[in-house]
Regions:
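Predominantly soluble domains enriched in secretory-pathway, periplasmic, or organellar proteins
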Residues: 20-344
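Bacterial N-terminal signal peptides
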Residues: 9-22
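N-terminal secretory signal peptides that target proteins for export/translocation
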Residues: 1-5
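Short amphipathic alpha-helical "recognition" segments used for binding
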Residues: 7-10, 161
Length: 344
C-alpha cells in the first residue's frame, strides 16, 4: 500500500558466518482472539480501510474511513471515538480502498487527508477539524506522509507511477506549493522516512525497494528485496532495520546501513500489506488479509525474527497500527470495524 516460526538465540560470532537468518515455521497452535471490536459509524456494509496510523502529537489512532468520507480519530486507551471530521462526500457504492478517504498524516498543527473524489488532499486544523485548504493532485492518492524536518507533504500516486512533493509554509491558512514530482516506474508502494539518513523508502511492485534522497528528491539506490510482491514498510531507524512485508506471506529485514542487505526473513500469513513496528518493545505486527491472522514478531538485536503470538483477525484484514504502548489496531474492512489486540 503499512505487519509461523521460532528462532533460538544467535551469538555475534555465529552471525558473522551467516548471510541471512531464515525462520522456520512454528507448529500449528490455536489462534488468539482480539480483546475488543470497535465499530465505526457508517460501516454496517463495510469500509474500505487502508492506511490507518497513530498520531503521537495528538495521542490518537487515525482511521480514514473510506467511502463514509470521514476521518475518525480514536482514543487508544478507551477505544472510543475522540473526533470525526468530514473529508469528502460519502460514496454511494460498497466499500473500496479508492473511495472517500484512505490515508492521513499529521504535521505542524495540521492534519492532511486524502480525497479520492477530487482527487486531492484536504488540510484540516488539528485543533478542531476545520478545513483550511484543499490541494489538487495529478492522480489518485495512495499514501499521504508529512516530512516534518523539511515541512513537506509527500503523496504517492501509483496509477501515475510517481510521488508528488509539496512544500508547506505554516500559517492560519497554510501556503502549499508543488515542489517536485518524483517518477517511480513500477511503483510506488508504501512510503517511510528515515530522517537520520535523509532518505525515503518505497517499494516497487516486484522484488525491489527504492531509496530516495529527501533533500534532492532523487532516487539514489535500488535494493533487491526477497519479496515476489513487496508491499508495506516499517522502519526502526535507531537499529537501521527496514521491514518489508511480502504479499505472498513473508516478512524481510533489510539493513539500511549496508546497502539493503537482507538480514532475516520469516513466514507469516498470506496477503500481507501494511505492517507496523514498535521500536520500544522491538515488536513487529504483520497481518495477512488472506490468512485472516496477524503475527506478532520479536526482533532481535541482529534483526532475527521470533514469532510471539498469532491472532485471528478477518478475511481482508490487511492494515495495522499501534500506539507504542502495547495496543495494536487491525482493520476489518468487510465488517467496517477495528480489532483491538493487547500486545503480550
Amino acid at each position: 500500500m503499512r505487519k509461523c516460526f521460532r528462532l533460538t538465540a544467535i551469538c555475534a560470532a555465529c552471525l558473522a558466518g551467516l548471510a541471512l537468518t531464515v525462520a522456520a515455521p512454528v507448529t500449528a497452535a490455536p489462534l488468539l482472539t482480539p480483546q475488543a471490536v470497535i465499530r465505526i459509524a457508517g460501516g454496517e456494509h463495510g469500509i474500505g480501510f487502508d492506511d490507518i496510523g497513530y498520531f503521537p502529537s495528538l495521542g490518537t489512532i487515525s482511521i480514514p474511513a473510506g467511502q463514509t468520507g470521514n476521518l475518525v480519530l480514536l482514543d487508544p486507551a478507551s477505544g472510543k471515538v475522540a473526533a470525526t471530521y468530514r473529508i469528502t462526500t460519502p460514496a454511494i457504492s460498497m466499500y473500496g480502498r479508492e473511495q472517500g478517504t484512505s490515508s492521513a498524516t499529521y504535521g505542524n498543527g495540521y492534519i492532511f487527508a486524502s480525497d479520492h473524489g477530487q482527487p486531492g488532499v484536504v488540510v484540516l486544523d488539528a485543533r478542531d477539524g476545520k478545513v483550511l485548504e484543499r490541494v489538487k493532485l495529478a492522480s489518485g492518492p495512495d499514501y499521504v506522509c508529512y516530512l516534518e524536518s523539511r515541512r513537506e507533504l509527500w503523496v504517492t500516486e501509483p496509477r501515475a507511477q510517481q510521488i508528488q512533493v509539496f512544500s508547506i509554509a505554516p500559517g492560519p491558512k497554510p501556503v502549499i506549493t508543488l515542489n517536485s514530482i518524483i517518477p517511480i516506474a513500477g511503483g510506488p508502494e508504501s512510503l517511510v522516512f528515515d530522517t537520520d539518513l535523509n532518505r525515503a523508502y518505497t517499494n516497487l511492485w516486484k522484488d525491489k525497494t527504492l531509496v530516495i534522497d529527501t533533500i534532492t528528491h532523487k532516487p539514489v539506490g535500488e535494493w533487491n528485496d526477497p519479496c515476489k510482491g513487496p508491499r508495506g514498510l516499517a522502519l526502526d531507524a535507531a537499529k537501521g532495520f527496514l521491514f518489508v512485508g511480502c504479499t505472498e506471506g513473508k516478512v524481510a529485514v533489510l539493513d539500511v546501513n549496508h546497502g539493503g542487505k537482507v538480514l532475516a526473513t520469516a513466514p507469516s500469513g498470506a496477503g500481507i500489506d501494511i505492517i507496523s513496528d514498535n521500536p520500544r518493545s522491538q515488536h513487529l505486527y504483520v497481518p495477512g488479509a488472506r490468512s485472516a491472522s496477524m503475527t506478532i514478531f520479536k526482533v532481535s538485536p541482529s534483526g532475527a525474527l521470533h514469532a510471539l503470538a498469532v491472532y485471528r483477525t478477518a478475511k481482508g484484514a490487511h492494515c495495522v497500527t499501534d500506539d507504542g504502548k502495547g495496543r495494536v489496531f487491525v482493520c476489518d474492512p468487510h465488517a467496517g470495524t477495528i480489532l483491538e489486540i493487547k500486545d503480550p
